[in-house]
């Protein structure tokens, strides 16, 4: 069963719990600056989660000279093969959404990898603005999904 990561911006309260969960899940000691999901804060308790779209035809993967970005057949995520990456940052420049990040501390590329099929940000979202749902349910409005889960 193929899963879809979905963001409902109407529900985001910009609490930052997803950023912290991501940072801890990826070993950056909870430093929000090292997260793969970022909240664009539009006001108090109003935000837009920004995360890799795992594009069908990803510009980041197309431009990579070493094919270091490949689709994970299980999760559908565009994964980084670190052994192939030459740190040219062409993928960072190519992403039209700004979701490929350069980590100055660790000198590596960062992007959402869906945590190997179990995105750690999702269960920490108190308003269910982030969801990881089966593809066939992805077109359904979030409200019925939440009621079904309760």
Give each language-model segment a name:
Residues 2-8, 23-24, 28, 34-71, ...:
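Flanking helices and flexible, charged tails adjoining ferredoxin-like Fe-S electron-transfer domains
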